[in-house]
């Protein structure tokens, strides 16, 4: 599933290509993925709208349109949003293409999704910034208002284990399985530790490592195992730099011990039992 670094990479790759362009029409081939404001049709509501800015909130991509509305795109497990310039639009269409946006410069924006879990939702800009999905979102880990003091105060109030806490989007927006495992590994913290058991120094390590691993993921253009590519169809490179995720049975990059892969609440968790306490 695309996490914060992947969605931010998609945003950056598309911003210079489609900002300022107008949506001439939309072909929607899988209606169940698209939602519009009450009383409007998705395709009609987008026709003639200009894309004025691309943003992101957590794992949600935000296409801000004129008229103070926003198209919220949640890629979920296997969603892809790829832009094709006019000279590229004759390229064969990928299987599972569920929506095509025709832009006024002759280019196309194609949304594909093998698993069909992703959604395209048109809402007011204010609503998109406040709550783009069903649940309330926590702070942005790379945001200027995400301070260590606030993070530490939030930790001491939680008896939740660290791994599920980092996956809780109401606690922090944007982390998923990959970057939660990586942050805990770098911070040398066991995923089963409870948040309230961390002392100040451990909390600071976790705070710093969350921000570091997310920024490194962005710098590497995301993590590509199977489905993820950016808005130009390019794979990321962070999979080559992972410490624990996807490396079960391999030696720890820090101590040489064996990386374990275990199930936690139905999710795979990767960690080094020697380093992470």
Swiss-Prot record:
Keyword Hydrolase carried by entry: yes
Molecular-function GO terms, alphabetical: 8-oxo-7,8-dihydroguanine DNA N-glycosylase activity; class I DNA-(apurinic or apyrimidinic site) endonuclease activity; damaged DNA binding; zinc ion binding
Active-site residue numbers: 2 (schiff-base intermediate with dna), 3 (proton donor), 59 (proton donor), 267 (proton donor)
Binding-site positions, DNA: 96, 115, 158
CDD domains: EcFpg-like_N
GO BP term (any one): base-excision repair
Cofactor: Zn(2+)
Keyword field: DNA damage, DNA repair, DNA-binding, Glycosidase, Hydrolase, Lyase, Metal-binding, Multifunctional enzyme, Zinc, Zinc-finger
Signal peptide from the UniProt entry: none
Zinc finger (FPG-type): 243-277
Entry EC number(s): 3.2.2.23, 4.2.99.18
Annotated cofactor note: Binds 1 zinc ion per subunit.
Catalytic activity: Hydrolysis of DNA containing ring-opened 7-methylguanine residues, releasing 2,6-diamino-4-hydroxy-5-(N-methyl)formamidopyrimidine; 2'-deoxyribonucleotide-(2'-deoxyribose 5'-phosphate)-2'-deoxyribonucleotide-DNA = a 3'-end 2'-deoxyribonucleotide-(2,3-dehydro-2,3-deoxyribose 5'-phosphate)-DNA + a 5'-end 5'-phospho-2'-deoxyribonucleoside-DNA + H(+)
Zinc among keywords: yes
Annotated NCBIfam families: fpg, PRK01103.1
Family: Belongs to the FPG family.
Function field: Involved in base excision repair of DNA damaged by oxidation or by mutagenic agents. Acts as a DNA glycosylase that recognizes and removes damaged bases. Has a preference for oxidized purines, such as 7,8-dihydro-8-oxoguanine (8-oxoG). Has AP (apurinic/apyrimidinic) lyase activity and introduces nicks in the DNA strand. Cleaves the DNA backbone by beta-delta elimination to generate a single-strand break at the site of the removed base with both 3'- and 5'-phosphates.
Oligomer and partners: Monomer.
The protein's name: Formamidopyrimidine-DNA glycosylase
């Amino acid at each position: 599933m695309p996490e914060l670094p992947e969605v931010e990479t998609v945003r950056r790759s598309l911003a210079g290509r489609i900002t300022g362009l107008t949506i001439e029409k939309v072909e929607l081939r899988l209606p169940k993925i698209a939602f519009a404001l009450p009383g409007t049709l998705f395709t009609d509501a987008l026709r003639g709208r200009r894309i004025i800015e691309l943003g992101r909130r957590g794992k949600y991509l935000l296409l801000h349109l004129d008229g103070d509305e926003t198209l919220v795109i949640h890629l979920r497990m296997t969603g892809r949003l790829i832009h094709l310039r006019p000279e590229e639009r004759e390229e064969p269409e990928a299987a599972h293409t569920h929506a095509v946006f025709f832009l006024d410069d002759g280019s196309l924006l194609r949304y594909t999704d093998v698993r069909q879990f992703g959604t395209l939702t048109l809402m007011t800009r204010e609503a998109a910034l406040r709550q783009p999905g069903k649940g309330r979102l926590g702070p942005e880990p790379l945001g200027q208002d995400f301070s260590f003091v606030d993070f530490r105060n939030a930790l001491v109030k939680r008896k939740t284990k660290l791994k599920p806490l980092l996956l809780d989007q109401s606690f922090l927006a944007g982390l998923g399985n990959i970057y939660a495992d990586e942050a805990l590994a770098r911070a040398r913290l066991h995923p089963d530790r409870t948040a309230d058991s961390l002392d100040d120094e451990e909390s600071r390590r976790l705070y710093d490592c969350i921000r570091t691993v997310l920024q490194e993921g962005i710098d590497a253009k995301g993590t590509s195992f199977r489905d993820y590519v950016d808005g130009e169809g390019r794979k990321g490179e962070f999979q080559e730099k992972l410490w624990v995720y996807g490396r079960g049975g391999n030696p720890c990059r820090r101590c040489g011990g064996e990386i374990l892969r275990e199930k936690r609440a139905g999710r795979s968790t990767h960690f080094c039992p020697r380093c992470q306490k």
